[in-house]
């Protein structure tokens, strides 16, 4: 009886999602279907598969599959948007380029991982107007849960840049094996976002990560040295990296020293 009720609720949710979004996107409702996302998107212009489920199981499985979990809210209805890019932005650390003035702007700033995940997540969410927020309340709850209790090797993290006690830049993302994926970030001071990015690249490189998954192609990522990988090529690299092991260092580090090291080694 319980399974029948779950089946009925699941089907009602799928039909509701279809009614809200139309027939333009594939829709799935179970964890096992996430492995079919590349096939569902094959030959399509769209980069999203939708699901009425936003929970740790679905989000973690989407991450493991090389997709980036996003969400959308219409009224009180939230749904998962599982994104698999046609081309993924990837930074391989020998390609890192430090833009001019980054080091001078880094003076006095320190970077920490997971010092205050909730604060950083809230700052990232609030950096964007409500109409542009894909970090919905339910997705934020799930990301917080995965931070406190990783699932299937997926752990969420906050990258935070401080000037004293003030949080001036940061981002949220997730780690699987030796791959870190950026989800979204913010900055409150000119240049602090670039300081955060270059400092994080140095941390990832020195901590044994294979590469940095930067998600969507944006000009500033190419300026840092990121390159675009077609979907199939990216997934092959991603699965290789997630089978390896790496982790973040404890405590906080000087952004200026990290960036100086980047300049010396290149």
Q: What are the roles of these predicted feature ranges?
A:
Residues 1-266:
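N-acyltransferase acceptor-side catalytic subdomain
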